[in-house]
Amino acid sequence: EVKLEESGGGLVQPGRSMKLSCVASGFTFSNYWMNWVRQSPEKGLEWVAEIRLKSHNYAIHYAESVKGRFTISRDDSKSSVYLQMNNLRAEDTGIYYCSTGFPSWGPGTLVTV
């Protein structure tokens, strides 16, 4: 069974930083691209960042709205993906989810700026 478990959210002041984590299980983590997405009432579901595989040199892509502020990373040995968020803004408020090529979602973690 594929499981994704996000953590690290909370209440943070504008301009501050926060790091989110996601632990995956039930599949070979190192074989899958990983994404962070977020959901808010204002913008709906919004893609945030993507990190590819070791064989792709861990290529990374970001949404324009977070480029230069957010950093995605992964640790295949821990089946985990991370999102370091700096210089947070009110518009970054939302529920953050990690996702991959399965129709499975974790509970998400709420970030309130």
UniProtKB/Swiss-Prot annotation:
Name the SMART domains on file. IG (SM00409), IGv (SM00406)
Q: What region holds the Ig-like domain?
A: 1-113
Arranged from A to Z, the UniProt key words for this protein are: Adaptive immunity, Disulfide bond, Immunity, Immunoglobulin
Q: Which GO terms describe its biological process?
A: immunoglobulin mediated immune response
UniProt keyword Oxidoreductase present: no
Q: Which GO terms describe its molecular function?
A: antigen binding
Coiled-coil spans in chain:
none
Q: Which cysteines are joined by disulfide bonds?
A: C22-C98
Q: Which InterPro entries match?
A: Ig-like_dom, Ig-like_dom_sf, Ig-like_fold, Ig_sub, Ig_V-set, IgHV
PROSITE patterns named among the record's database cross-references: IG_LIKE
GO cellular component terms listed in the entry, alphabetical order? extracellular region; immunoglobulin complex
Please, what other remarks does the record include? This chain was isolated from a myeloma protein that binds inulin.
Which protein, by its recorded name, is this? Ig heavy chain V region AMPC1
Which lineage? Eukaryota, Metazoa, Chordata, Craniata, Vertebrata
